């Protein structure tokens, strides 16, 4: 009897230890698969149209990832995220072929915030989350500035802290883009960490935002330094500006706000970009991007949202206005179908493309474009 009692006690103790260990650490597998069929008018200089399955995104870029945490006690925990982007139409890896191109970091979380190390989003991307209504959609802000939905940096150290609704964020990269084809089209790579050149290919960004139950405001600043193979693309058909010197700067400043009430949400903001070069032969360039959007749940399962964008680049004499409308029907908590359409009007010299679906749809100068897509999205 004593032997049986002892065995039961040992078994119970092991179960208790196992339960405690499980409570102290966890790893979550998650992902999104999003694709569909798209039509784009005037998709080349000859005015031809295209039907296709886009490579990059629909409502959201497809991805899978692992997210984990370990409780270290005293309010501290170790955290990590490994997130891989992929293209549904052919199964290839995104972000220049990186295995974990969307995010790959490890860090420490505590009562005073989180510090993390690795490939991470910059503060530009994080600060826009509240006000940019349709986000990284195929007909979103990325059509006019493709860096915005791809604002990540290799070799980065970040800090995020929240207190009574305020969030302070900061990031610093020792070399922002060291693999693949660059974080956005035409940007080039910029590996950095070169001996004797402490600022080459650096990226630093800061963010301050405030979120209340029914509204929020945010501001951010990001500065990229030049280096070998670095460029600045304005996505308007003009050749990218070379940023070969560490003194060259590509800076983005952003302010935005949002409000929400009873199933409705309204957001608006401004994103200013300034490229300043160290060479008198290379002109400085600036652009200003304005946006306003709204969303409304008509029923708990039916969402309608849309956004209007306006970009002005006075140096290139290029301007564009784009409007997008999207409807989403929720089949379940994890699956949905959607239909969306957008129209982009280019000024006489501009060649912005309405679609952020992976290139190959640049129109002739001054020509407008229509984009239409129907798709399906599943989250796990």
Predicted region positions:
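Detector for outer-membrane/organellar transmembrane beta-barrel domains
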Residues: 199, 206-324, 328, 340-341
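Hydrophobic, lipid-facing positions within transmembrane beta-strands of outer-membrane proteins
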Residues: 60-64, 102-108, 153-157, 202-206, ...
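Solvent-exposed loop segments that connect transmembrane elements
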Residues: 41-50, 92-94, 175-201, 224-249, ...
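N-terminal signal peptide c-region/cleavage motif recognized by signal peptidases
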Residues: 18-21, 26
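Outer membrane beta-barrel
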Residues: 25-39, 51-177, 200, 209-216, ...
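Residue-level detector of the transmembrane beta-barrel scaffold of outer-membrane proteins
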Residues: 28-30, 77-79, 114-118, 167-169, ...
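Outer-membrane beta-barrel "beta-signal"
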Residues: 331, 366-380
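Bacterial N-terminal signal peptides that target proteins for export
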Residues: 1-10
């Amino acid at each position: 009897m004593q032997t049986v009692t002892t065995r039961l006690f040992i078994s119970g103790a092991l179960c208790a230890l196992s339960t405690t260990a499980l409570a102290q650490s966890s790893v979550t597998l998650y992902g999104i698969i999003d694709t569909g069929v798209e039509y784009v008018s005037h998709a080349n200089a000859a005015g031809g149209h295209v039907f296709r399955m886009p490579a990059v995104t629909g409502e959201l870029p497809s991805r899978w990832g692992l997210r984990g945490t370990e409780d270290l006690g005293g309010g501290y925990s170790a955290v990590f995220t490994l997130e891989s982007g992929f293209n549904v139409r052919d199964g290839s890896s995104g972000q220049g072929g990186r295995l974990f191109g969307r995010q790959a970091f490890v860090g420490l979380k505590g009562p005073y915030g989180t510090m993390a190390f690795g490939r991470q989003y910059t503060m530009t991307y994080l600060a826009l989350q509240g006000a940019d209504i349709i986000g990284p959609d195929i007909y979103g802000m990325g059509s006019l500035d493709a860096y915005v939905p791809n604002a990540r940096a290799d070799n980065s150290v970040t800090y995020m802290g929240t207190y009574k609704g305020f969030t302070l964020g900061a990031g610093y990269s020792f070399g922002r883009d060291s693999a693949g084809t660059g974080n956005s089209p035409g940007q080039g790579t910029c590996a950095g960490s070169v001996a004797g050149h402490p600022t080459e290919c650096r990226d630093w960004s800061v963010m301050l935002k405030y979120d209340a139950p029914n509204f929020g405001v945010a501001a951010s600043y990001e500065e990229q330094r030049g280096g070998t193979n670095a460029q600045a693309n304005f996505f308007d058909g003009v050749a990218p500006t070379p940023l070969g010197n560490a003194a060259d700067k590509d800076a983005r400043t952003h302010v935005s706000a949002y409000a929400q009430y009873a199933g409705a949400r309204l957001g608006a903001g401004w994103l200013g970009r300034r490229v300043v070069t160290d060479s008198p032969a290379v002109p400085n360039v600036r652009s200003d991007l304005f946006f306003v959007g709204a969303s409304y749940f008509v029923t708990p399962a039916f969402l309608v949202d849309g956004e209007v964008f306006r970009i002005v680049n006075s140096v290139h004499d290029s301007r564009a206005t784009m409007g997008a409308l999207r409807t989403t029907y929720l089949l379940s908590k994890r699956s949905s179908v959607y239909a969306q359409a957008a129209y982009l009007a280019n000024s006489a010299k501009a060649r912005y493309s309405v679609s952020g679906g992976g290139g190959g749809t640049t129109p002739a100068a001054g020509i407008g474009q229509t984009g239409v897509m129907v798709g399906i999205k599943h989250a796990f």
